[in-house]
From Swiss-Prot:
Protein name, entry field: Uncharacterized outer membrane usher protein YhcD
Source organism: Escherichia coli (strain K12)
Major location category of this protein: membrane
GO CC aspect terms: cell outer membrane
Molecular functions per Gene Ontology: fimbrial usher porin activity
Membrane topology: Multi-pass membrane protein
């Protein structure tokens, strides 16, 4: 980027007040010319900064912070007076609401949101903005300006192949999980296939194909094809038909917890803590404020709010948890499906399903649903209640009628979750079914004979900073014939020490179908010891199926794109040792993992995996190391630069020889950042704006363009005609009188955008002279700057 801000650095450090929020012009400052000269600044450019620290006219890529939260680099324009232009593109990337008045130019944000302060920081290439929290776009609220449309095809793949060799033979197995599809104008067609090959025998399992579209105005997602009965309270089945349900990405997200207060000074800092941990910090303007959707750690601990004023004073207050934790959420929105049950069942009747949910009050909710098919009907209703701040209770009753077999029954369920004092939590669940109650999938299964009579489940957890965390959970099921009764008990303890983490797990199972014989306890002890940059050593012992094993392993990373794992284990009873190792690598355009193992003297295993995605779009074919989701984008470097690393929410991706890269996953209708890793750029290339904020609707195929600037820079050693070095702080112009830069030290000039033939004019209060420079026609790509010498004559 053109470093036009270099002149402002010295003045900016000493003089950088914020832009006046009330529109009152700060009085002009008269700089002492001798003082400027002593600071190494040409007095002739002082008029640029006579009123406040500001940027020279033009466009800059600045680090923008809104209420203390960095929004990344945003292209920012300043007019001939150094005033900022808050246009629509800037406000969108900064996450600020756009004033209601229609306008294509610059918005008067101070008029729209009084109290706004804007502080340019030329010496840091940054811009600080303080606004009322009401001016910030909440997550999930603003659906405007989301990109829609676009066309691209995709193929996601996950391939695996393994071979096992034994003393008496061998076995081969391969599988391919494939997802193919195409996005056209927000419509999505997807087909899933799961192919396997076992010792030469091929099969195709679990295939499905469907068409999908989200209707934004209705906040509804529609799927047609092989879909599921997505009923919120009843079990469904796979059908050939149509499913309509709320699009979760269009539902308002956030905690729903808000904090209000009053700040006495502009740019006051509000700190919110829960359980002694800082969970949110934001700058607010003077006056009353409301902070929505505070990211609370839990709904049961009070919030401690501290307002730190600009003058250093502070005041704090408590927001009791009882004001915000007495609420429950239901599965809101209507869900509807109609179609024919697929061919995986004994019967394939036509079926209709409908369900919905309602929040009755902040502390009560209800869900209900029905399923109607040929010879089958079912209905259910579920209620949820928060009678106490730390107690949640829900109950459900379902009824079904199988007219073909003349069966009618009910099913009852009760759940409770109680957060007790001293970090103790309790969960319990009870389910009981009549002998003749049937879910849809059970009613159309001719072989279904033994329903479960009842299930009891209990969970208890407790944590302590000294003793660690404990978790106990178990369940017991009873069947009507008594042959399929079973029970399960799990106990877990874990504790993090200074140099290691220890965990102990025990599982006990008992099955009545095996005459109440012990199915074999599972016992596992693991010690993890981190070392180095990102490596972990483990020591463990496990007891299962009446056998004891001891082992040790090491896992870690070789580089940002490569990891490894090695393991050795000893079977105490069989007196055999097994060795295993694997290495995984992100090859920028796919991911590969290789593993091998040996057990005893006659057993060997080998396997390899490969996964990633392929996008076919109007710019060509682009490979991704990650799975490509419903909503994605194609990033493009305009100079076809390969190997540039781009960070996104889904992980890093790299440009190919065309300069393209797939941004594989974008959260629909949410603003997300895509950023160039400038360290991966060639040394002679700059990015005008290395961070782009994007927002797309579901199914959209977006385009993200990055303008690469091929920079020729030069470090010049300049002497005057008398042989002395050019003084520090002298302004340098081109032959047409345009300012270029300032000498940064005696005889030293750093110049951007050099040309093969250049003429530089140097003027100060004592003399003026001219320099003629000549550089090679072709710029070297492997150096940050070229060097040259010149004499000013």
């Amino acid at each position: 980027m053109l470093k036009k801000t270099l002149l402002a650095y010295t003045i900016g450090f000493a003089f950088s007040p914020p832009a006046n929020a009330d529109g009152i012009e700060i009085a002009a400052v008269d700089f002492d010319r001798e003082t400027l000269k002593s600071l190494g600044v040409d007095p002739n450019i002082s008029h640029y900064f006579s009123r406040s620290a500001r940027f020279l006219p033009g466009e800059y890529s600045l680090i923008v912070s809104v209420n203390g939260e960095k929004k990344g680099n945003i292209a920012t324009r300043f007019d001939e007076n150094g005033d900022i232009c808050l246009d629509q593109a800037f406000l969108q990337q900064a996450g600020l609401k756009i004033p209601s008045e229609e306008k294509n130019g610059c918005y008067d944000y101070i008029l729209s949101y009084p109290g706004t302060t804007i502080t340019p920081l030329p010496n840091q290439e940054a811009l600080d903005i303080i606004v009322s929290p009401q001016a910030i776009i909440p997550i999930g609220l603003d659906l405007t300006n989301a990109a829609t449309g676009g066309t691209a095809a995709l193929l996601n793949y996950s391939l695996m192949s393994s071979r096992a060799e034994f003393s008496n033979g061998s076995s081969d197995y391969s599988q391919a999980a494939l997802e193919g599809g195409i996005n056209i104008n927000d419509w999505m067609l997807r087909s899933h296939q799961f192919l396997t090959q076992t010792n030469g025998t091929f099969s195709n399992q679990n295939s499905s194909t469907y068409l999908q579209r989200t209707f934004t105005d209705l906040k509804t997602l529609m799927r047609a094809g092989e879909v599921n009965l997505n009923n919120s309270v009843l079990e469904g089945a796979s059908i050939y038909g149509i499913e309509i349900a709320p699009d979760n990405a269009l539902q308002t997200s956030g905690s729903g917890v808000q904090v209000t207060g009053i700040a006495n000074t502009s740019q006051a800092r509000v700190e919110i803590r829960q359980q002694g941990v800082l969970i949110h910090s934001i700058l607010v303007p003077a006056g009353a404020f409301t902070i929505p959707d505070v990211p609370v750690r839990n709904g049961n601990s009070d919030l401690n709010v501290t307002v730190v004023e600009t003058d250093g004073s502070s005041h704090n207050y408590i927001v009791p948890s009882t004001l915000f934790n007495q609420h429950v959420e239901s599965f809101q929105g209507y869900r509807f499906a109609i179609g024919r049950v697929d061919d995986d069942y004994d019967e394939s009747p036509w079926v209709i399903s409908a369900s919905s949910g309602w929040n009755l009050t902040r502390w009560s909710a209800m869900n209900g649903g029905v399923i109607v098919a040929e010879n089958y009907q079912a209905a259910s209703i579920r209620s949820s209640l928060v009678p106490l701040p730390d107690l949640t209770v829900s109950s459900q009753i379902s009824t079904s009628q199988d007219t073909k077999d003349s069966l009618q029954g009910q099913k009852y369920r009760l759940d409770a979750n109680y957060n007790l004092p001293f970090s103790l939590g309790l969960t319990t669940s009870l389910t009981r079914s009549d002998r003749h109650y049937r879910e849809l999938s059970e009613a159309i299964d001719d072989d279904y004979t033994d329903p479960t009579k009842s299930t009891y489940a209990l969970g208890l957890n407790w944590s302590n900073s000294i003793l660690g965390g404990f978790n106990i959970s178990g369940y017991k099921t009873y069947s009507y014939d008594g042959d399929n009764d079973s029970s399960n008990l799990n106990i877990n303890w874990n504790k993090a020490f200074k140099h290691a983490t220890v965990s102990v797990n025990w599982q006990h199972q008992l099955s009545a179908s095996e005459n109440n014989e012990d199915d074999g306890d599972l016992f596992y002890v693991n010690i993890s010891i981190p070392f180095g940059r990102s490596n972990t050593a483990t020591l463990y012992t496990r007891h299962d199926d009446h056998k004891t094993h001891y082992g040790t392993g090491v896992m870690g990373v070789v580089s940002d794109e490569m990891s490894y794992y090695v393991n050795a284990e000893r079977d105490h009873d069989e007196r055999e040792t097994s060795l295993n190792g694997s290495i995984s690598s992100n090859l920028h355009y796919t991911q590969v993992s290789l593993a091998a193992g040996a057990s005893g003297s006659d057993s060997r295993t080998y396997n390899g995996t490969m996964s990633g995605g392929i996008a076919v779009h109007d710019q060509g074919v682009t490979f991704s190391p990650w799975t490509i989701n419903d909503t994605f984008a194609i990033a493009k470097m305009d100079n076809n630069i390969a190997g540039v690393r781009i960070t996104s929410q889904a992980g890093p991706v790299w440009t190919d020889f065309r300069g393209n890269a797939v941004i594989p996953s974008i959260q629909p209708w949410r603003t997300s950042g895509v950023e160039i890793d400038t360290a991966s750029l060639p040394k002679n290339v700059d990015i005008g704006n290395g961070t782009k904020m994007i927002k797309q609707g579901r199914g959209a195929v977006g385009k993200v363009g990055f303008s690469a600037i091929t920079q020729r820079r030069a470090l010049l050693n300049i002497t005057l005609s008398d042989g002395k070095k050019l003084p520090r702080g002298v302004a340098i112009e081109d032959s047409e009188g345009n300012y270029l830069t300032t000498s940064v030290d005696d005889g030293v000039v750093f110049l951007n955008n050099i040309k093969p033939d250049m003429v530089l004019d140097i003027k100060d209060e004592q003399q003026s002279c001219r320099i003629h420079l000549t550089f090679p026609e072709d710029a070297p790509k492997d150096v940050f700057y070229e060097t040259a010498t010149g004499e000013c004559q």
